[in-house]
């Protein structure tokens, strides 16, 4: 029973096991007490139901509490997870933001270091603090605080203010001006505004910049001068990049000190006269730029396009106070524009002077040694009209005037001998329009540095278009070289107007003393009274047959413009009577008597009758005396004179008889005889003391040469030794061909044969410059024939 009673408790405790046990005990003991059990079960059935409800409710409460706890726990875990995620995300975002910020700052500082010159010049990359410090120093230097003293004046290191100003204005080709930003009043303008705008400084001082610009540009100028943020509206064109930007992007910088201004406006051009000295190449460019806006109507102002660039500066500067009478003094601190105005280069096609200024006047060509074109500059089309392919492979002589072809050939031969030196020659060039253009060609040779051989000749051909320059006349129309004296070595293209003043006076003096054939009718000598003589000889007018040997370049390379200028067609016949009276053909011996007398000493081998010795004018004696003193003493020998003992003689001139046709005259001076292809002569057109002498022919052109002697040998001019007489050293080994027999031409031949006398022409020029000296017998100790006289 106890067990039975215990079973219900057990069943009550575990209700799910009660029915199972009751139903699972069909034994008699259980069956015998089944009623009780059933009753007990029945009796407690309600209680069992309540217990089950209570047990169920207990389990439900436990489940609810557990679920609530789980929910709370899960809720707390979700909150914690979300907060942790938020914190993690926040930390990640902050790190990312900081990393991006550091990257941006590094990029900006790197860009700043590239912009600062002191940073970029360092060998290794500086740290950020150094970059910032150098950037601040650079900004201070840009604002001028680094080079200004306490009074605010600029102190350059090595230039003064005036030198710096002139250098800046010359380099910029413009003018400097300072304008008040508030009122537009011109504070300062440089004097270079006159050559740029043809306006004096006085017109700018006291006026405003608005008065100087075009009326349509006043508003734009006011916007550029304004420093307020709301002054500009709309969009702004950046001249540097060519992009259109909104003004809001730059408005914050308009009040910044040192902000840059760059704009284009039209300024009024004045009519003041410009100094001719300042009319240089830049002035031509200015005139071309001024014409860029088209033609100017009568009575209307002329405007030109000016590009203004500058910076906004504080005015007055720090530490500088304006005077009380200044109208701007009471307005307090303000700003001003410091800018440079330059003429904007225009490319307007309607410029009338573009064709004249921009048309090239020269071109470069390359030739071989024969003168054939191997390269031609493209500017030859505008200069001479030919295309480059039309000139390539052709000789430049083919385009030269026939009278100048020999001159051009000789110049090419001469430039080859000069080896790198520049040689200039002037000739007439045939253009494509069949016109003759005066061309000045400056040529030099290019040598291979390894083989030292001449590769080609480079020529710069310039078209001379100066109408005031007279063309070079032919040789037949020029003054004879023998009369020009020291000016004979000048270029043929130079006229008498181009000679130095001293040489002009020298030339006029000699021309007065040696008159032409038109002015030789009356010539009175102070010592000898002579009568007019005349002669005619056909043999003396024969042309020179070997002029090319006479004027070859190997005679004297220092005079390339004298010898090549004589062409074959210009060599005319000349008679021996064309020798001027003031020039000596050769020197005589020292055995002349002091008084003039019939020339028994001169014997022409029976061909020449006795004639009268005529004393020439004093200038010839002076010239020959000075030439003889400066001759080379190294050539002196026993029968010849040295530079210290050789006296100078005037020419003792005798007439040549017309009957001497087969051989030239021979002169006997005591025992001194020499054969010559020419004869000395007295002054034509002057009276002589002898009435039976033959007459000389009239003077022909002086520009040609003496006829050669038939059958003469090359050694015909070699002097023969004699007693008490000497021979000029330049006659030894001399060629048989001579030009007009003047002392200057003999000196040239002497120089060609005596290289030890390189300065004889310079000495001769210096000697002939002053002819005012007085010569007497003291200067001629070996002569008694010259009485004291003064010129």
Curated annotation (Swiss-Prot):
Residues 424-467 form the PAC domain. Transmembrane segments: none annotated. One of its GO terms (biological process) is positive regulation of transcription by RNA polymerase II. The modification Phosphoserine is found at residue 77. Residues 167-171 are annotated as: Mediates the transcription activity and dimerization of the AHR:ARNT complex. The keyword Nucleus applies. GO terms for cellular component: cytoplasm; nuclear aryl hydrocarbon receptor complex; nuclear body; nucleus; RNA polymerase II transcription regulator complex; transcription regulator complex. There is a cross-link at residue 58 (Glycyl lysine isopeptide (Lys-Gly) (interchain with G-Cter in SUMO2)). InterPro entries: bHLH_dom, Circadian_TF, HLH_DNA-bd_sf, Nuc_translocat, PAC, PAS, PAS-like_dom_sf, PAS_fold. Its main location: nucleus. Changing residue 456 to D: Decreases heterodimer formation with EPAS1. Decreases heterodimer formation with HIF1A. Significantly destabilizes ARNT?s heterodimeric interactions with both NPAS1 and NPAS3. Compromises SIM1:ARNT heterodimer stability. Monomer. Homodimer only upon binding to a DNA. Efficient DNA binding requires dimerization with another bHLH protein. Interacts with TACC3. Interacts with HIF1A, EPAS1, NPAS1 and NPAS3; forms a heterodimer that binds core DNA sequence 5'-TACGTG-3' within the hypoxia response element (HRE) of target gene promoters. Forms a heterodimer with AHRR, as well as with other bHLH proteins. Interacts with NOCA7. Interacts with AHR; the heterodimer ARNT:AHR binds to core DNA sequence 5'-TGCGTG-3' within the dioxin response element (DRE) of target gene promoters and activates their transcription. Changing residue 448 to A: Decreases heterodimer formation with EPAS1. Decreases heterodimer formation with HIF1A. Impairs heterodimer formation with EPAS1. Impairs heterodimer formation with HIF1A. GO terms for molecular function: aryl hydrocarbon receptor binding; cis-regulatory region sequence-specific DNA binding; DNA-binding transcription factor activity; nuclear receptor activity; protein heterodimerization activity; protein homodimerization activity; RNA polymerase II cis-regulatory region sequence-specific DNA binding; sequence-specific DNA binding. Residues 161-235, 349-419 form the PAS domain. Changing residue 366 to A: Markedly decreases heterodimer formation with EPAS1. Markedly decreases heterodimer formation with HIF1A. Impairs heterodimer formation with EPAS1. Impairs heterodimer formation with HIF1A. This is Aryl hydrocarbon receptor nuclear translocator. Changing residue 98 to A: Reduces DNA binding. It is found in: Nucleus. It comes from Mus musculus. The gene is Arnt. Changing residue 112 to E: Impairs heterodimer formation with EPAS1. Impairs heterodimer formation with HIF1A. Significantly destabilizes ARNT?s heterodimeric interactions with both NPAS1 and NPAS3. Compromises SIM1:ARNT heterodimer stability. Residues 539-554 have a biased composition (Basic and acidic residues). The modification N-acetylalanine is found at residue 2.
